[in-house]
Amino acid sequence: MATSAAAKDDDSPATRFAVDQLRSIIERIERLEEEKKAISEDIKDVYAESKGNGFDVKALRTIIRLRKQDPNERQEEESILETYMQALGMV
């Protein structure tokens, strides 16, 4: 008998709305994941193209990472790296 009460609750407008909303969210995420996959493949192709043109992919990735950083954070990181390298006699 508890099952029939649960079935009635499942047919309520609020439940249908929640289910529809959940389905919509899941489908949006799935579409975005597909787009992300396509973009990742495009980025990989650009790196392969740059390598074919003689560019160092590791250096390009480093530049991309550095450009994303806040200038102050980047300066602090570079300063710490310089300090450590000096301490190890690498500079």
From Swiss-Prot:
It comes from the Bacteria. InterPro entries: GapR-like (IPR018753), GapR-like_DNA-bd (IPR046367). GO terms for molecular function: DNA binding. Pfam families: GapR_DNA-bd. Belongs to the UPF0335 family. HAMAP family: UPF0335. This is UPF0335 protein BBta_6866.
